[in-house]
Design a protein with these regions (language model features):
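Glycine-rich FAD pyrophosphate-binding loop
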Residues: 23-47
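FAD-binding beta-loop-beta segment adjacent to the flavin cofactor pocket
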Residues: 330-335, 387-422
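N-terminal Rossmann-like FAD-binding beta1-loop-alpha1 element of flavoenzymes
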Residues: 4-31
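Mid-domain catalytic core of redox enzymes
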Residues: 229-341, 346-352, 366-371, 481, ...
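A conserved FAD-binding loop/helix module that cradles the flavin
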Residues: 419-442
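Helical element adjacent to the flavin cofactor pocket in flavoenzyme catalytic cores
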Residues: 187-248, 252, 256, 260
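Active-site-proximal substrate-binding core of FAD-dependent oxidoreductases
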Residues: 441-489
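Mobile amphipathic helical/loop "lid" adjacent to a hydrophobic cofactor/ligand pocket
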Residues: 66-67, 71, 76-184, 452-455
Length: 518
């Protein structure tokens, strides 16, 4: 019996999952990777003797497929049940938010959140209203933004809208007026149902703790990993793929081909013959991606009262958040370091053409408004602008333009977080879910009927229960809305926010990104 063969293009998380699932079932697999390591955006690089990630990654409880990998390779995650907000000039005072794991956590949020209690009630109700919408509205929800969905609602105050705008941008690099309401509904539904632990992180960097153990698995399964293999062409003949062309002029052939590269790479191969064989793939050109930059600061001195969990800089123009990985990771020499702050800038587009040194100075200038850090306190720094490796963003109407794992070309498959999957967000769980679906489709198409890969879908609360909860709290929401309306109408200084936040709000409402290409 002939052993089936597969060429997997792209050694990111999706490509690794596809390669493993096929190799487990006896396939001969070649994995092509352009760089000198696997992992893609979920990996780390050594720069100046230190490991630097694409950006800090989180592992929520609603990552069942990613957490299955973590459990398989024997890694114990570090769990958090809260996160924090800092306001300019307020350190070390912080606003702590507990994950919505129960009534006590919700009560804490209402009376200890960033906004007064009545705005917090309205914000909670806005989330409840969104996640309780029926699945039959899926098509409508994908064609309206999250902010567009709630703006016309009777319960929406200006502060609630602004809070939602900032949270979305920092979490996904997507402006709230661009984020598909369908994506927002799904992610919120998953998080509300599985809120404990709210967030988890690895006890070390992604490459060493998460990716390298999977690389060893692939090697033990006989997967042939070819580093430094830059693909430049998908060779077609009579409507099927016949080879993958490399930059050095060589061509490689197999029975099936799985393209597991990022969207900005995959769509460069949509030439005449490939497009003609499956015109729907051309819709990938309508999909968008934005950079989410990472800045690492190693400090010379200790900062008192620095939280161990994630911290969001409220009102930050560059949408900054961070975590002190120094207290959770070990250095390359095996010792725990001092403060090593891992920042993410979700609004980095204004700095796209600024030099690394200049961008670092501008980011540090804003960071110093929130933390007592001066340039003299920084022992070393690394900046990953990530403009060459942007994140796919779930804009309005994107779902219909996203490809499925199986193309209409009988031996070509796709995997990656931009491919249609149940998670519907650019994240590790989305990439793994799409990869498992692609692997299952490949095996099914080649006669496999048993032990196919199974995609675990995060649980959600029953809609009937959500609707009931929404109805029961309407009287409280009505009272909160009246108070918020009176405040907005008669309070010129809007006491729901600090003066700093009032000044920051216009900046948050600005769109500093270049016009989108249509």
């Amino acid at each position: 019996m002939t052993i089936p063969s597969a060429l997997v293009v792209g050694g990111g998380l999706a490509g690794m999952v596809v390669a493993r699932e096929l190799a487990l079932r006896g396939w001969r697999v070649i994995l092509l990777e352009r760089s000198r390591r696997l992992g893609g955006k979920a990996g780390s690089d050594i720069k100046n003797g230190r490991l630097v990630e694409h950006g800090y990654h989180v592992f929520p409880q609603w990552y069942p497929n990613v957490r299955a990998i973590v459990e398989r390779i024997g890694v114990q995650l570090i769990d958090f049940d809260r996160y924090h907000f800092l306001l300019p000039g307020g350190y070390p005072r912080k606003v702590t938010v507990l994950g919505p794991s129960g009534l006590s956590a919700m009560w804490h949020y209402v009376f200890n959140g960033l906004l007064p209690w009545y705005h917090n009630i309205l914000y909670i109700y806005s989330v409840l209203d969104m996640i309780s919408r029926p699945l039959s509205e899926k098509r409508f929800l994908d064609r309206v933004s999250q902010i567009g969905l709630i703006r016309g609602k009777w319960y929406t105050s200006e502060s609630v809208a602004e809070m939602g705008q900032e949270n979305v941008l920092k979490a996904s690099a997507i402006p709230v007026y661009d984020l598909s309401a369908m994506t927002a509904k799904r992610i919120a539904s998953y998080w509300v149902r599985q809120a404990s632990p709210f967030l988890s992180i690895l006890p070390g960097d992604l490459q060493t703790v998460f990716i390298d153990p999977q690389v060893r698995e692939l090697e033990e399964l006989g997967v042939e990993i070819r580093y430094g293999s830059e693909v430049c062409d998908v060779v077609m003949h009579e409507g099927v793929v016949t080879a993958i062309g490399l930059r050095d002029g060589t061509e490689l052939s197999a029975d099936i081909y799985a393209l597991c590269t990022p969207i900005e790479v995959t769509r460069t191969w949509l030439h005449d013959h490939l497009y003609k064989a499956d015109p729907e793939l051309g819709n990938m050109h309508f999909l968008e991606a934005q950079p989410m930059a990472a800045l690492y600061l190693r400090l010379r001195r200790e900062l008192p009262d620095l939280p161990r969990e994630h911290v969001f800089l409220h009102g930050s123009y560059y949408a900054l958040s961070f975590i002190d990985v120094g207290r959770h990771w070990k250095r390359l020499d095996g010792e725990h370091g001092g403060h090593q702050l891992s920042f993410i800038s979700s609004n980095y587009s204004p700095l796209n053409e600024v030099s690394k040194e200049g961008a670092k100075d501008l980011l540090l200038e804003e960071i110093s408004e929130y933390l007592p850090i001066t340039p003299a306190d920084v022992e070393s720094w690394e900046l990953n602008p990530n403009t060459d490796v942007p994140l796919f963003i779930n804009t309005i109407g994107a779902w219909s333009n996203r490809p499925r794992p199986k193309t209409t070309i009988k031996n070509l498959y796709l995997a990656g977080d931009y491919v249609k999957n149940a998670i519907d967000l650019a994240c590790m769980e989305g990439a793994v879910s799409a990869a498992l679906e692609a692997a299952a489709q490949i095996l099914s198409d080649h006669g496999e009927t048993e032990s196919l890969p199974v995609v675990q879908i995060p649980a959600e609360w029953p809609r009937a229960l959500l609707v009931l909860a929404r109805i029961l709290i309407v009287p409280f929401v009505a009272v909160a809305r009246v108070i918020a309306w009176l405040e907005e109408k008669f309070s010129p200084h809007r006491p729901d926010a600090s003066e700093v936040r009032i000044k920051a709000t216009p900046r948050l409402q600005m769109d500093s990104r270049p016009p989108r290409k249509r």
